[in-house]
Amino acid sequence: MIRYEKGRCRVLAKLLRPKTTVSAHCDLPCGVYDPAQARIEAESVKAIIEKYHANEDPVFRARAIGIKEQRSNLVKEHLWVLWTDYFKPPHFEKYPQLNQLFNEATKLAGAAGTKQSLDVKVAEDLLSKISEIDKIFWETKQA
């Protein structure tokens, strides 16, 4: 049986409490960001949709849909990292359309977009939004 004494618990809590609190903008602040990751996944989504329409095999089509949904999720994840970790308040001040672009792009990669749709036009719209984000991203890197 363990006996707790007030003084000893306070001492133990004090010993275990971190001495310094640190924070970072991401899980591992590597500083490597590039919209190309989202673009490559979005290009993959578009290619999968095109291949889906060109193939009548139901097994192939089922696999294509599963892979397309995974790739659509990866597009969203890469966009979210850029949106929440790379871009800072000064970027949003200089580019007021940036939040709207990210919102539209992540929706195009989500359930209302390429994740659920088999429309090549939706994938092209997603690539267009990523291209706009890419342009702004590289402008901020030059600054």
Regions found by a protein language model. Name each.
Residues 61-79:
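Alpha-helical segments in soluble extracytoplasmic regions
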